[in-house]
A protein has these predicted regions:
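Concave beta-strand-loop units of leucine-rich repeat
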Residues: 72, 78-84, 95, 100-107, ...
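Acidic/charged coordination and interface sites in well-structured regions
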Residues: 88, 133, 155
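N-terminal capping/linker segments that flank leucine-rich repeat
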Residues: 1-105, 117, 139
């Protein structure tokens, strides 16, 4: 396993409170390592080969600090729709081309400039607490979807001549 640090991982907290205890992460483009926050580590050589994504079922209720080594990934989809996800932090993901993040709480700022400089497509929706988003230096952006972020008051979009689609609504 690579050493998982704040600089090279995606970090967030999973809050298992009800009967639904399963977390699904869809990824593609390279190897990944997941620390599920309960002492279990999982290495995935080819996450795209796993139909429905990488799935983990928590046995007990509680809060778990999840870390995902994502330096090689080109796509990741993390959603808190079915299980509560909060406090998201992004590490260095230089190969990331498609980033999908939905239904996440307790995250006030996302700065993709440093961590996802080569991202081409972003889908950021239903962040209950997101106030500020920065993507002005993500020069390869082609598809931008930002929606249903009720506290979003500041976005640094910059100039993106290659953008083919921009959807920004209910923010």
């Amino acid at each position: 396993f690579p050493v998982l640090t704040d600089a090279n991982t995606i970090r967030f907290t999973v809050n298992v409170t009800g009967d639904w205890r399963q977390l699904n992460i869809v990824a593609d483009g390279g190897r990944m390592v997941i620390d599920w926050g309960n002492g279990r580590m999982q290495k995935v050589e080819d996450p795209s080969s796993m139909a429905g994504g990488v799935t983990y079922r928590y046995g007990n209720k509680g809060s778990y600090n999840v870390r995902i080594w994502a330096e090689e990934l080109q796509l990741i989809d993390i959603s808190g729709l079915l299980i509560s996800i909060s406090d998201l932090h992004l590490g260095n993901m230089p190969r990331m081309k498609s980033l999908v993040l939905n239904s996440i709480t307790d995250t006030r700022e996302l700065n993709l400039n440093t961590f996802c400089p080569n991202v081409e497509s972003i889908n950021i929706g239903s962040f209950a607490d997101l106030e500020h988003l920065e993507v002005e230096h993500c020069s390869r952006l082609r598809n931008i979807q930002i929606y249903s972020n009720p506290k979003l008051t500041s976005m640094e979009l910059g100039n993106h001549p290659e953008v083919e689609e921009l959807y920004c609504s209910y923010n």
